[in-house]
Amino acid sequence: MAFSPTPQQRAIIEHTEGPVLVIAGPGSGKTFTLVQRITHLIVDKSVPTEQIFVATFTEKAANEIEDRIARELLSRNIVVNFDDMYIGTFHSICLKILEDNRDFTRLKKNFTVMDQFDQTYFFFQHLAEFEKVGQVADFVGSDKMSRWLKASTICDWMNKLSEELVNSEKLASDSHPKLQMLGKWHLLYQQLLEQENLLDFSMIQAETLRLFKNHEEAG
């Protein structure tokens, strides 16, 4: 059963000059309008598929949007390569951008993205190297910690620094001993990640931002 856009939806679908902010509640036809807008851009405005960028909060939502776009285009006898489009969660889109522009990053071919367990285990394996920089017990004020808890503690702090885009070199030269320790840990962490061709979940967006800041030709 085909649906026709309302006048308000039609205005959103056909708006192409500058950004448009749409505030709508559940069941108001947001996905329908978005799918129609993308179809309009591809079919009526001849926008290349590689210039289509749709970010969602969940993979389920991204898959649904992709499926509905495919069905809408197929109903018009149009077939496109969805690998060219950027449709997914913020993290999955950033990963695709990094993969497409790997030559401009520190990453090498077949890099690995660590999940939470992998990352904690990474710190567990390299704990001795981090404790040469600074003892976890000194940082938290307790020496009654297992090696795994120490690894988990460093992991949590490194993620916070990555997510907040903290300047590690500046932090490493801070006059406060604990801040200095965090900065030196983070510098060591980045060095080890580069050596082992790894990326963690918290650094995906930061690496993408760094890519765009340092290489305008990337995209």
Predicted regions and their residues:
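Conserved ATP-dependent motor core of P-loop NTPases, especially the RecA-like helicase ATPase domain
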Residues: 56, 77-78, 83-90, 95, ...
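P-loop NTPase Walker
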Residues: 1-107
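A generic structural signal for well-ordered alpha-helical segments enriched in polar/charged residues
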Residues: 40, 71, 75, 125-129, ...
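Solvent-exposed alpha-helical segments within well-ordered globular domains of core cellular machineries
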Residues: 63, 67, 71, 124-125, ...
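Accessory N-terminal region flanking or inserted into the helicase ATPase core
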Residues: 1-23, 28, 32-33, 51-53, ...
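Charge-rich, low-complexity amphipathic helices
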Residues: 34, 60, 64, 91, ...
